[in-house]
Amino acid sequence: MKRNLFIALFFFAASVPLQAQQSPFIRLTETSLMHESRATPSPLDKEVVNDRFVSFQWPLPLEARPEGAPMDGFEHLVKKVDKSKLAYKIRYAQDADFKKGLVQADTRWPFFNPEKPLTPGIWYWQYGYVDNGQTTWSKVLQVTVGDSKQKFCPPSLKALLAKVPKTHPRVWVEKENWHSFIGQSMNKPERQWYLERADKVLATPMKSVKDINTSQVKNLTNQMQINSYLTRESRRIIDAEESNTEAVIRAYILTKEKKYADAAVKRVFTMMDWDKDKNVKGDFNASALLSLCSMAYDTFYDQLSDAQRKQLLNAIKEKGTDMYKHFNNYLENHIAENHIWQMTLRILTMAAFSVYGELPEADIWTDYCYNVWLARFPGLNKDGGWHNGDSYFTVNTRTLIEVPYFYSRLTGFDYFSDPWYENNVMYTIFQQPPFSKSGGNGSSHQNVARPNSIRIGYLDALAKLTGNTYAADFVRRTLVKEPDYMKKALLNKPGDLAWFRLQCNKPLPEGPGLTALPWGYVFPETGLASFQTNWDRVGSNAMWSFRSSPYGSTSHALANQNAFNTFYGGKPIFYSSGHHIEFTDAHSMLCHRATRGHNTILINGMGQRIGVEGYGWIPRYYAGEKIGYVLGDASNAYGKVTSPLWLKRGEQSEVAYTPENGWDDVPLKTFRRHIVHLGNTGYIFIYDELESSEPADYTFMLHTVAEPMTVDQNNGKYVHVQGLSGRGGASDAYIFSSGALQTDTTSRFFVPAHNWLRADDKGNFKKYPNHWHFMAKSEKSKVYRFATIINTHALKHPAKAPEILSDGRIKAGGWLISVNVKTEGNAQFFIRSTKESVSISYKAGQETVVNENGYETRMSDVLPELEI
């Protein structure tokens, strides 16, 4: 089968002063590669921008850089910044002295999008901080603008606003197209879904904000728990009534029937001030009410009285102003402000355009929302990955589709031509193939047992909007098994795209499907990789995933640098453990986020830092037809937690970052993990290079979540660990090491998984199951090496143990492996197939060399493009 060859061709353009280094090996010394708040300008000095328009961005002044609230509901603890006093200047020209063709502008935010795309060539620019009328300019920066004909250059705000209708409705349907929209909806199943739900709502009594359950507050031990509990319980009421009311509003748009209008207006006016109740917590609740008020204003504009319109405008003004005050001079500089990215920016955007021209504040809201989208959205980087992981990725679904689709409808410009979306299709597919468990990264990944209906709806939208046939095949394979699968997402707060499907009449494209994809894909900026053996039959697919990320473990990311997971038949085997009970709950922090919960390595029993400081990266990778390779570097990930934001979170959650809990300084100098994908055999080879400045011990970890592991140490050459999927799959790991290993297995978490937060509708708190943990601890040594062969296969076909030949080579799965696991000599390995012309070799400090089909590929370390 013909496969495309994917080789690392990324060039570094960030603030790490190492790009001139000639050695194949790069040793990083930076405290972090990313920052919670922007620390570098964009574009970086001497950067070449070829694929999109130039958006100028720069750091906030030092005194105005908030860390953000440690948690939702703790905004009162954040340093207050008088944003009205923040002002900036920018100037740019193709003349380094700024004397010819100078463009200069004032801005209230630390970014600026030129009204017209810059012409190809070299440009010079400066940003300035304005204080009491005096401007402090940055150094002169240089950017080269490429002349790619495929460059993404969306319209300016001025062009967009000229297309905003002066009539209502204008957001969820345009008044002039309303009749035809209703007609086009008649043959679509989504229409009936909304009407069925709306009719059910009309027959059901409405809940009240007084129904918020506060009964457990007395049993909670700190303010974090109390706030989290009330946020969850108030969202239980408000989210339910928001979706009910939204169903009725959408039913009215689909029918123009008065019964829906009357019921929806009554509900919105009942809920309008629920956010003022003392038991209502969290920005999602406030944004839900803003969403309903703006939907009602836009949809029922012609039915509302002047007094009702005024009341809704006042509510929109109050809630929208609060959101804008929070967003501006914060969101645009933040690495990834979760709730704003997920939902609340989308809600403010739709509210702003609903009242544009009728509420003066909407002038600045539309300006900010549109231009910050162009500057920062839709993705966090170019490679299309999502650093927060698969569970929290889908919480961004409506934002990623509805906002640019709204802009596309207004202007006629294709906002989905942003190259990020094509890359994101690859992330969405490779990190969770059809009917398979997620890759195992990010908070709550345990809950994602198969691509959910939101994910399928997202791929459906991207297939139609970008013409991506891989996404289309993914959707078809799902819907042939369960035709109404996407209905499960109906009125899901962050993920329902049923309304998009009513608006969009494009069919799923035809063309190459999943079997035309390469076996593996790497996202170097996000720090993720995954490889498969069978795209066509999930039941026979042996998959593995890997993470070593410049984002570290901030936000919803985990401290799992250089960690891998294995899967068979779509079910996890060796897999990240622990439960996401709450963002900073003790179990969540010490057993789910912390390194001890993942298939990686502890140094002197200590794990990786929490925050952007606990970072890894992927220096080299290769995805070919017969072999694949990923190198992760977690040398800088370990040590004491130093992030001010995470120290504050720990303090408020009563989580101590102590040696007893797994954090301390360690003498680690190098931790590089090589993983070789040995064709479609189900075998992978893992080689760990470990070195410290003084003798240290190294603990190799494996975890399972379905069934216990079995451990066999009878063979004096290796330790054999078998993990089971519980559904007919197995991974057999054969661990070779520099010396004897002290092993231990347990089914107990370091901290019990106590559910104090997540009750069902009847108030029952489900119990979280235990997982199984294997640890193999080395003796103390400055240098140590592990070499692990893992065979992932169907349990009915028992694994054959590796054969150790007389010359010390290892034979496994049709491959011959020569590897140095001794502490003496260079770290090195050589692997070749016994059946085909393919090999890979590595020696410490030198290039990795792959020979495949007569072609040689030599890989040196390459830093990915990073900014913030």
Regions found by a protein language model. Give the residues of each.
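Pro/Thr/Ser/Gly-rich low-complexity, intrinsically disordered linker/stalk tracts
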Residues: 22-76
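Low-complexity, Pro/Ser/Thr- and charge-rich linker/hinge segments at domain boundaries
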Residues: 24, 143-173, 711-712
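Recognizes extended acidic, P/S/T-rich segments that occur
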Residues: 72-75, 79-120
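Extracellular fibronectin type III
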Residues: 132-147
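CBM-like, beta-strand-rich accessory domains located in the C-terminal region of large
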Residues: 170, 580-868
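Aromatic-lined, polymer-binding surfaces characteristic
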Residues: 194-195, 219, 226-437, 444
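Carbohydrate-active enzyme catalytic cores, enriched for enzymes
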Residues: 355, 395-573, 779-785, 802-868
